[in-house]
Amino acid sequence: GFAFFLAWELTEDHPVVDLSLFKGRNFWAGSIATAIAYGLFFANVVLMPLWLQQYMGYTATRSGMVMAQVGLLAIVLSPVVGKNLAKVDPRKFVTFSFLVFALVLWMRAQFSTQTDFDTILIPTVIQGIGMAFFFIPLVSITLSGIEPHRMAAASGVSNFMRITAGAFGTSIATTLWEDRAKWHHVHLVEVVSSGRTVTADALTGMQNLGLTSPQSLALINRWVDEQAFTLSAIEIFYASALMFLALIPFVWITRPRRGG
């Protein structure tokens, strides 16, 4: 089916999806860079509030207060980026953006279940800088050199790839988060249940406070879950940071025309 689709679209005079756009280096490299970067960005935007609400004790409102700050610097800096886009190589803007995203994700990879609100907030604010230098320059690179009559088709294909990558990125990230958390949970349980004095003392202390044995075990399991899902989130943050860095050479494959 897919082979038939390719053959049809490549030979049709008026194709629904103009695959010949991918003959242009700027378009295919820019579209792929945009799709992967957006998938990483959106996956982490979804993962953060899930972790905060489920394992850090944040309410939906409080986690929303953390994530909403990402727009502050983006709103301020986006007009500056747009104004200077014709003067500066957009690849430099995108490179700076990916470095900022990598820094933000590295900062998040230092989180623990004891991390306070302000420490969690700082990377989110900084992420706004990356957003300002991300979307506008990448669109400029992707559409650079496209003939005016093909601009609508090129924009549509690029946006479709970006939105699809966002959906895939979210699904992959949340699935990996849960799978890796299960792995960490198993290994943490082995440590907790290995007959250590600390575990026995903790159970005794909780039972002295009036908790039954099942309640004490359930509470310890909850603590193990918190650590397991936090470790899993940290792994995803690290991996995402490395992927943003890996995308930087990919951006420099393109040869955008100055000013778009």
Describe each region flagged by the PLM.
Residues V139, M161-I253:
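Hydrophobic transmembrane architecture of multi-pass small-molecule transporters
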Residues E12-D13, Y58, A181-H185, V251, ...:
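Perimembrane helix-loop junctions in membrane proteins
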Residues A33, V157-M161:
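Hydrophobic alpha-helical segments of secondary membrane carriers
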Residues G1-A153, G259-G260:
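Transmembrane core module of solute transporters
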